[in-house]
Amino acid sequence: MSNSSARPESLGEYLAHLPLSDEQRAELASCTSFSELHQRLAANPAASSAEAVQASVGPRLTVGSAAELEDAEMLGVDGSGRLCLKIAPPIKRTKVVPEPWRTNVLIRMWRRMTGRPNAPQPPKRELPPARWRTVGSIRRYILLALMIGQTIVAGWYMKGILPYQGWSFVDFDEIVNQPLWDTVVQVWPYALQTSILILFGILFCWVSAGFWTALMGFLELLTGRDKYKISGSSAGNEPIAPEARTALVMPICNEDVPRVFAGLRATFESVAASGNLDRFDFFVLSDTNDTDIAVAEQQAWLDVCRETKGFGRIFYRRRRRRVKRKSGNLDDFCRRWGGEYKYMVVLDADSVMSGECLSSLVRLMEANPDAGIIQTGPKASGMDTLYARMQQFATRVYGPLFTAGLHFWQLGESHYWGHNAIIRMKPFIEHCALAPLPGKGAFAGAILSHDFVEAALMRRAGWGVWIAYDLPGSYEELPPNLLDELKRDRRWCHGNLMNFRLFLVKGMHPVHRAVFLTGVMSYLSAPLWFLFLVLSTALLATNTLMEPQYFIEPYQLYPLWPQWHPEKAVALFSTTIVLLFLPKLLSVILIWAKGAVEYGGRVKVTLSMLMEMLFSMLLAPVRMIFHTRFVLAAFLGWAATWNSPQRDDDSTPWGEAVRRHGPQTLLGVAWAALVAWLNPSFLWWLAPIVGSLVLSIPVSVISSRTRLGLAAKDEKLFLIPEEYATPQELLATDQYTHENRWHALHDGFVRAVVDPRQNALACAMATARHGQAAPIEALRAERVAKAIEVGPKGLDLNTRLALLSDPVALSRLHEQVWAEHNAAWIDVWRASINNDPHSPLLPLHPENAGQPALVGA
């Protein structure tokens, strides 16, 4: 540790960044070294350099704000007597033990046959008998009959459309004895048609399921007579019992810090306004491994606690060992603090919920003691790009039909989407911890899409899973552009394919087995559709290039002509269009019936629907190609990155669009040229597909523009109720996001090393509270020496994380950087300050400076 004399200019610069009075600053300016400075700050002149810099953490942190932190009882000491902030409640551990998966039904059967019992499962309760369970089963049998019946009729029509009618004219005895090529030529058209017919049946059944779901949702919302909706079980004004404590947990990972804490603050203030704040605690559960973002999170937590007086109510925890991703993050919370709460509400990084909505969820849980999870229907809002506004419009207009329809078919055996939902803690801890999937490869290891699995385990344990589809006050945001949405879809695709391994796990309810199946089909339908189109093109090439065989039997008197029934083709095409687009029309009819003012009026909402339909038709083939790639990547074991999606409005550059969509454009051109060469008249049928692929680059770029989205908003196109009459929670979120960006902390790790107060905050919030041990001391010295040697730009991520987590090493690095006047660190810090004039930790910034007004306010 250096004890070199302090340079006057560096000592003055150091003191200038502490909010001291003129008298205090003048008194400390007489120090001859930074070691002496920290000794005097700590009021301990006998302390060594290492002890002094650590002891000065408290004074550096509390200067000018000691009363605030002391009144909130936020200051404490660790086992070694070092100052720390009480950023989380005392840990009271609860046992969280995941049950190993037994996914191989053959192994289970073999063990039973050989007299070796399978491992016992944890005890589970039986969901009490209720009328809704019988009604739900009957409804689902009806849905299955409707889907299968509709698919059989459509398949019969499709069979009549295809030119080669069945295999009856193929002589199997003859093809065995004839040359292989002759067999291929004879069988090929029939094999193609059979494959096309099978694919058509699967895809049509998938479309049929969505149609009947939307139709029943339309009827539920139109009549308003759903006697099984869970929101009807509470009057909505019952007092919440003191023991019904609820933790609001927000798992985050390398997120947009200003937006995250703006939404958290808006939600906190709304809960406070509801009068039920004493029943809720808030937890930010960080898995961030970007040290700049981690430091920004620390500062944002301190700021939001100060602004809301939320000390002791808003907590922050950053994991050092990031296992099992988001599900592991929640497991860690449940293990440390879950036993102290009766309920848990999971928020996403972009979630905002009103206090009334959260209070209603707790009341519904209290009124339904057999409910394990109650999921709200989040409303998408808050984005301004043209793409995001069209998606917001689609989810806001069409989404309620599908959500109500899901509730109609599933009732208390429903979906959980991983956020904006309330969970009963005790059964969740006992039954919903997720073990890794056994085996090796892309579909083994930590479960990626945890939400569907947790819902299935909750129901298997004997607890209901409900959707409160009509509960207002639940909000989320959507990706701003197509490419960001596709990045998210890749993760979801891999996760849903992994989940299908649980399809045959013992004890799963049939509804949740179907949920696993629909999760797979959400993405597997893309390669199936692509294969259907490819085989259809191959059949066209077969009919065009291969000489047809009109006489396939000896002594055949009449030729066998390939058949074509255009009237059946038109009828089937029309039916498919109705199934795809009638739900959208029903959504608009429902808005007409309920009132269209909040959507811009009847004319504007209808025009918006037509434009959105055209846009969705343009994007469907593009998504098909990408999802096909994602499915192939998952099966081939290509890694799916888990980067957080873009949460802010962001346009797609032309260069990135060309890189991402260029292969699709070339595919569209080549496909169109091939079909035009084979049969130009068939190109009209394929034009919506190849045309969309050819236009994918400009559509992706243009739709990502914020200017076009705002222009559409000015014309009341794609208008949603949250834009017509913005709820207070969303207004507050926008305002706080704007303010947070104004004061956003950049280059956080350099600030945590160099800045006097930022270093104090980082040391006080560091979590590696080791005692004295020679190996630990040696490792600390090695890390500090490395940081001094290579500077901030040469420091690797693991060393950064280790330094940020260790209060002793971080404080020593801070002292050594200033004592040696290390230019590699201090120059970067100065540049950061010059580029970041609104940083909240600069005392030279006038405290009464006004906040910038919200743009557009």
Curated annotation (Swiss-Prot):
GO terms for cellular component: plasma membrane. It is a multi-pass membrane protein. Pfam families: Glycos_transf_2. Pathway: Glycan metabolism; osmoregulated periplasmic glucan (OPG) biosynthesis. The chain crosses the membrane at residues 142-162, 196-216, 515-535, 572-592, 606-626, 682-702. One of its GO terms (biological process) is glucan biosynthetic process. It is found in: Cell inner membrane. The keyword DNA-binding does not apply. CDD domains: Glucan_BSP_MdoH. It comes from the Bacteria. Its main location: membrane. Its EC number is 2.4.1.-. One of its GO terms (molecular function) is hexosyltransferase activity. The keyword Membrane applies. Keywords: Cell inner membrane, Cell membrane, Glycosyltransferase, Membrane, Transferase, Transmembrane, Transmembrane helix. PANTHER family: CELLULOSE SYNTHASE CATALYTIC SUBUNIT A [UDP-FORMING], GLUCANS BIOSYNTHESIS GLUCOSYLTRANSFERASE H. Involved in the biosynthesis of osmoregulated periplasmic glucans (OPGs). Belongs to the glycosyltransferase 2 family. OpgH subfamily. This is Glucans biosynthesis glucosyltransferase H.
